[in-house]
Amino acid sequence: MFKKLFHSALWGLAAAGVILFAVPKLNNSSLFSADDIVSFNSAVRIASPAVVNVYNRSFSSASINDSDQLQVNNLGSGVIMTKDGYILTNKHVIQNADQIVVALQNGNIYEANLIGSDNLTDLAVLKIKANNLSTIPQNKERQVRVGDIALAIGNPYNLGQSVSQGIISAVGRSAVGDSLGRQNFIQTDASINRGNSGGALINSAGELVGISTLSIGKTANEIAEGLNFAIPISIANDVLYKIIRDGRVIRGYFGVQSEIAANSNGGIVITGVTANSPAAKAGIQVGDVILRLNKQDNLSIREMMQIISDTKPNTEVIVTISRLGKVIDLPVIIEEFPSN
């Protein structure tokens, strides 16, 4: 038995010697060149100049005899969205600020003006007086997929710009934490800490995919790791342009709660109608099934909500419903969503 083991060991050593002789570089550290190292450095270099530090400063008085002084009340991050100085951040970062200061990665510091904010998405738009600023590329054709690499860039705990890496854990998340509104969060395990809010979530190509917003374990006082969320850039862009144009986000309002019908005919079942809402005024009832909205059928709940949200207040839409076997067209006057 020992003889067999001895022969096996000899054969193993001989085979190893042949391999090392044939491929001498295997025993040389130069086998791994800089080009062989997996790195996201190029993605970070593309995006990082457009990620800024945001400081919320408020007046405070240490004592009755001291004059009021501006002190940092909150901090976060922001993303430069246009070359002429429009910046997206989270509303909770700049809420109740007496002064908003933005620090760029090149060392330049600006006082920012608040253009407007949106409660439902927790987004705010700032403006600084600067030109030819760096922005992050976007790719509308590239879908965010579960399993994609995700890089979060921000200013956690005011340490300075930092990058954390993870993957896209899920998309289309709703009912997250204490957040309100029409949610469609990107979930990631890339770390988002205090100070990261309002920063960039990018992919491995350096393209902007979301605005970092919250972490469940840090907002709900729960022991949780890797449950971090970002607002998809498509929603963030929509909010940005509406705030730049109107100073706020104006949304259409319908006033129903709903779920997808379980029967083979499809449709959206109304499970609740808000009193005095446009739906209630139009005569829509619990149990009605929405078949079409302005002649568009086979809609998901999310698609229906988006159509209504994009409809200007005081616009009439035709809602086709099924009630007790009858198909009825009901005109509904869309009102403005009471965001507060």
What does each of the following model-derived ranges do?
Residues 80-81, 321-325:
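Short hydrophobic alpha-helical segments used for membrane anchoring or interfacial signaling
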Residues 6-12, 21-266, 274-275, 301-305, ...:
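Serine-dependent protease modules
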Residues 1-4:
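Positively charged n-region of N-terminal signal peptides that target proteins for export
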Residues 109, 327-329:
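A structural signal for beta-strand boundary/capping segments at domain termini and interdomain linkers
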